[in-house]
Amino acid sequence: MEKIKRVIFQQLLYMLLPVLMSIIIGDPFELSPVGGNKFRPVKNEIAPYKVVMENWRGDNKSRLGLGRLQFVDEVFGPESLEFDLLGRGPYAGLADGRVVRWMGDGIGWETFSLVTHNWSEKICAKGVHSTTPKQWKFESHCGRPLGLRFDKKTGDLYIADAYYGLLVVGPEGGIAKPLATHVQGKPILFANDLDIHNNGSIFFTDTSQRYNRVNHFLIMLEGEATGRLLRYDPPTRETHVVLENLAFPNGVQLSKDQSSLFFTETTNCRLMRFWLEGPKSGKTEVIANLPGFPDNVRANGKGQIWVAIDCCRTKVQEVLVNHPWTRSVYFRLPVPMQYLARLAGMRMYTVISLFDEEGRVVDVLEDKEGDVMKLMSEVREVNGKLWIGTVAHNHIATLSYP
């Protein structure tokens, strides 16, 4: 009798197991990190992990770990940093929707600009919680300034805001004026970074046409490539599509002679170059494959560019990247994203790398244990010091260099 019961139980188990697995993978209760979204993973155009890591120049001294954290719990997610024509600053775009300016020890930080009249302290000012999910439902209301650039001719500050598009504010600050919120009749869903050409044109990235900033992780997990490089022309007030079908286009930096433009593709872990002039005009090329996921790119004034790179790649991620069906299953599991990332071997540490304009590595600084630097977003080299922003933490890091 016991044997019969055991056989019946096993048969029921075999019958129910596929049903149970289909329920888990189908995620009908939307318990997974991608629940409630039309998650459609595709294969990425990414260089092989082994090849990239074998040729990558590391930092055995972990010099980035010698950095100093400043303004702790005074600034919230300072993604991009900028200094004005008089050398004042840094200016920083914060997760609570403000652009702030450092006024010195006697005064501290002051609000320099807002990207919308909608901003209110009651709704938007979450302090140290601004970089947590508590702020996410307010981001589209309050704004999220990402890229910052001063026009060297006028002193105006141009802002790429994730929700309000491309904006500009005068040297005295105030409410920023929107310049580009739509292109080809469709809204700019995720303006990210920008740079200003000597002819006045502003080049900026629109990271995705499907997901906004709050859902930025879905862009990477899915591998979707609906991002664009855009150009705004002040005389005509028109916005044009320069490049499309990009996988999480992020940081933007014009070359020293303005003949080309560098930008990062975060999902594909690479630094790209688009030619504006010369025999290669209109062509795009990969100039560096990276060990992790790049954010902003900034010139140091010497014909070299800094790239901030986070969460270095792993062998498990290589499998997920090359086989979209594995992502479809893995990220539909009813497990919080932080644990899935940990299981995939994702380490939260930062690499910053200095390249020449041909894509050759000049220097690499790492914080291999992530003791000081995590989720760094931008590097500015100013007067023998590196100023390093972060999208997700409440401080600015500095480090003497070289």
Where are the predicted features?
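Asp-box/WD-like beta-propeller blade repeats and closely related beta-sheet repeat scaffolds
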Residues: 126-146, 151-156, 160-220, 224-227
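Surface loop/turn motifs at the tips and blade-to-blade linkers of beta-strand repeat domains
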Residues: 69-75, 113-116, 136-141, 179-186, ...
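Beta-strand-rich domains and repeat architectures in extracellular enzymes and scaffolds
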Residues: 7-17, 23-56, 62-99, 370-377
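Beta-propeller domains
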Residues: 41-43, 48-59, 85-128, 165, ...
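Short, conserved, GDST-rich strand-edge loop motifs in beta-rich repeat architectures
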Residues: 36-41, 204-224, 310-347, 398
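Short loop/turn segments that connect beta-strands within beta-propeller blades
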Residues: 103-107, 170-174, 232-237, 275-280, ...
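Residue-level detector of Asp-centered blade-edge/turn motifs that repeat once per structural unit
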Residues: 84-87, 150-154, 196-199, 256-258, ...
